Amino acid sequence: MSYPGDKADALSITDFQRRLALAPNTEAVDQFNPSAEIQRLNLRFDITKLRSALANLEQRKSFSDEVWGVIPLTQRPSQSGPWSDNDLSGRYYMRADERYEEAAFEDCVDEAEFSELVPDLADTYFAHVHEVLTRHMKIGRMRLLRKVAYSANSWHRDPEPRIHIPIITNPGSLLIVNHHCTHLPADGHVYFTDTRAYHTAVNGGLRSRVHLTAALPEGLL
């Protein structure tokens, strides 16, 4: 039986023995390492104000789930009720088993519909973030995503790319896109992540990680 990785180069035993003598780099694990699909933008917010806004918001609202929690920051215009379960997640694609065949999961979400800031956030720093982002790009669902310690997402791809603004993080919080792995520091920067490629998020640290994310509907495939 053949597998998709069979054509990859294999390390010879001689090279393997040489490799054993080389010490790995253990000092750069908390640094940002860009790739074609993960880029830091020249756009930055005040991390102290972001963390303060998050702490204040958590006194009023709860994350939707104990493991992969969501707090919506935008909504459909004049929306009166909460997001549906599908709105919290939305369409994604996986190659879920040994057949390596892609399948779609959950229903599509029209990201462009989520154009309005949730009204009770108008007096928060998240309103400033929303105003600045929409000045530079079209965004869809803007959410706070929490990832608890010792957890990971599925290996999947989305219909459109995302931006990430890390707020609470740790060196074990990693993003992997097309097998490229990097940490995203919580330094106030906006990070472009092309989540149209296969990706996952991992929190291998001791504390929860919280990112502000926003979908980019103009990148819909």
Which functions belong to the PLM regions below?
Residues G140, P159-P161, S208:
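Residues that flank catalytic or metal-binding motifs in active/ligand-binding sites
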